[in-house]
Amino acid sequence: MAGPLPPLNQEPAFQKLQEYYDSKAKDLNIKDLFVKDSKRFSKYSLRLHTQNDGEILLDYSKNRINDEVWDLLLALAKVRRVNAARDAMFSGQHINITENRAVLHTALRNRGTDPVLVDDKDVMPDVRAELAHMKEFTNMVISGVWRGCTGKQITDVVNIGIGGSDLGPLMVTEALKPYGKGLHSHFVSNIDGTHLAEVLKKVNYETTLFIVASKTFTTQETITNATSAKTWLLEHSKEPESVAKHFVALSTNKEKVTEFGIDSTNMFGFWDWVGGRYSLWSAIGLSICLSIGFENFEQLLDGAHFMDNHFKTTPFEKNAPVILALLGVWYSNFFKAETHALLPYDQYLHRFAAYFQQGDMESNGKFVSKSGKPVKYSTGPIVWGEPGTNGQHAFYQLIHQGTRLIPCDFIAPAQTHNPIAGGKHHKILLSNFLAQTEALMAGKTVDEARTELSKAGLCGNELDNLLPHKVFVGNRPTNSIVVKKVSPFTLGALIALYEHKIFVQGIIWDINSFDQWGVELGKQLAKAIEPELDHCNEVSTHDSSTNGLINFIKANWK
């Protein structure tokens, strides 16, 4: 087995990129690159052909790259052993080194017949059994066979979870609303009682099903919310037996689940090789199944499996996740870009950026390498975004004319689920999608701005004073991803695309993308502070700021 990787900044392939950046990067003007190469779009774009959901287009031609840069980036991926790391993940090796675990969310959506081994055991029979359990339960609820404690059919589903037990199911349920089967979906994550209280105002105890998503069934926020929801149910039903009719668990802790009052036959399990932020493909996706039906959930799995196969089998130069990953490394480690914007031009995808805030920032927000040594280069970026065209009227100003370089991914469907006004809305939406990447690339020169102002009737000092404010530097990099339509299949493919992009970047940076120790420290301190809020005495056991905050809150508690 090959030894550890050298620090990235000591890698000869990285140093060659640094030399190129230092000497030639200032000459990489995207607009000029198109002028010089009439085939640039075809050279720097991919079309992925799906069986039933059309093509997926990735256009990465509007980036600050040329053939020389691209060859150097591909060479970097090879010397950082991305191939070997990818194979290790898919083969069930324990690549999560700090927790000594395999990383096999890909097994959850494996639609083939080949075994998937973890510690010499084929996990696929267990995966298929859990999917069958989810299918049976989903069909019972949607068909009305499963009923509440008073015999009424379920109309509302409340998913209680946090982090990966909330963000993924919420994002997918919102994205696939057009495929809904009639149940109303609600999500409660925040320990702030307002979140649960507002949901409970909208539902009827007789027709509501609660899903408690906690692997250990001990997650503080989730179990506190679930216990309060159970209290609310019992206040209305007056019957302890009603809990079993209105609660199911996504957990592996049978003892805690049954103690809560949930029938263990209504417990859906998953495994320690499923990370929270990759768990929507598992039983954590039960709320997705109940929203869109199990057949559509299978299509979601199919789409992800399609992208898994693409990632596994395609050479780097045509491999969509690798391409996105390398572009991100180029901007983060050489141009010092600190953020990356995800900008879906589809309102159904309004939670897509929030989902990958966790997916990316929790995975690659690390400052030590796998060997435990602090790195001396940038790792995970800040990920953010909002749907178009809302973002255009909020933060695009900074992307266009600010001092920071912000690489952006624009995502759009060619077809809409809602062609109202004869498709006029969608045509306007897509025209904005197309215009923004062109504008970010081309900008507006001084001469162009002067001509525009002259045509508007300005001249002299008035024109000269306004002129610099109307100039756009341009040369802002973007990727465009276009699907035929947002469907379960294409959404599954998009999610897997970004999962694998994040993985590849983690390999290049030599960090463990599959733990999240940064979540723990705040939890530990919160447990110490909580009892200090139970009494009215002043606190002096912390730093003066924390003491001051605690004492101010206690003084204003009532």
From Swiss-Prot:
Residue ranges crossing the lipid bilayer per the database entry: none
Superkingdom in the source lineage: Eukaryota
SUPFAM superfamilies membership: SIS domain
Reaction catalysis annotation: alpha-D-glucose 6-phosphate = beta-D-fructose 6-phosphate
MF terms in GO: carbohydrate derivative binding; glucose-6-phosphate isomerase activity; monosaccharide binding
Alphabetized HAMAP family for the sequence: G6P_isomerase
Name the UniProt record assigns to this protein: Glucose-6-phosphate isomerase
Organism expressing this protein natively: Drosophila simulans (Fruit fly)
The encoding gene: Pgi
